């Protein structure tokens, strides 16, 4: 199965999220995603990685990763280049899972637990408008809303004024910190 097209998608409602759809000659489409500065990541995918991927075998996942990494590793181990590699990697694993009729976790060694706890990251997705609540100093209100939906943990940004937005130890004692 060959890679025929790399399609990047971002929408105004989630302005920092990028989705990648990798199309194949057999009609399967793999989906990958990343967060932050989507146009920069899309540029790396289209301007740098397209030549490494288009027309190539989908299932050479490790080889694709190594080729992408060796092409951009002089930029370091972070930034748009690494997010682009990750996005492509996820989409390729998605394609392999679809082709084999298996969830990706089976391909990566199998399930090791039946349930996992989830947490919320303040990035304005869904009904909570998390990022805006955090920026406007309403993190405590956001935490209460999340608790009401069963989400018991929230990741806040390291530069957040924790003592102000959640009331520090007082907020924790109140069940929202």
PLM regions and their residue ranges:
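Structured beta-strand/loop patches that form or line metal/cofactor-binding pockets in enzymes
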Residues: 1-31, 35
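Structured loop/turn residues at beta-strand edges in well-structured enzyme cores
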Residues: 1, 86, 114, 149
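Residues that form or immediately flank small-molecule/cofactor binding pockets and catalytic motifs
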Residues: 8-11, 109, 123
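Metal-dependent enolase-superfamily TIM-barrel catalytic cores that perform enediolate-based chemistry
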Residues: 115, 120-177
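Metal- or metallocofactor-binding catalytic centers and their adjacent structured scaffolds
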Residues: 25-100
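Flexible hinge/switch segments at interdomain interfaces of large molecular machines
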Residues: 108-115
């Amino acid at each position: 199965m060959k890679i025929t097209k790399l399609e990047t998608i971002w929408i105004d409602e989630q302005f920092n999220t990028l989705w990648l759809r990798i199309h194949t000659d057999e009609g399967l489409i793999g989906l990958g995603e990343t967060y932050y500065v989507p146009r920069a990541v899309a540029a790396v995918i289209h301007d740098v990685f397209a030549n490494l991927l288009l027309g190539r075998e989908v299932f050479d996942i490790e080889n694709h990763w190594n080729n992408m990494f060796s092409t951009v590793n002089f930029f370091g181990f972070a930034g748009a280049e690494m997010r682009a590699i990750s996005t492509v990697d996820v989409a390729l694993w998605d394609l392999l899972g679809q082709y084999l009729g298996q969830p990706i976790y089976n391909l990566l060694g199998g399930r090791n637990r039946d349930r996992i706890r989830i947490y919320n990251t303040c990035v304005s997705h869904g009904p909570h408008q998390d990022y805006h609540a955090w920026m406007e100093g309403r993190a405590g209100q956001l935490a209460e809303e999340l608790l009401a939906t069963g989400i018991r943990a929230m990741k806040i940004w390291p530069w957040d004024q924790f003592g102000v937005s959640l009331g520090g130890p007082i907020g924790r004692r109140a069940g929202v910190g």
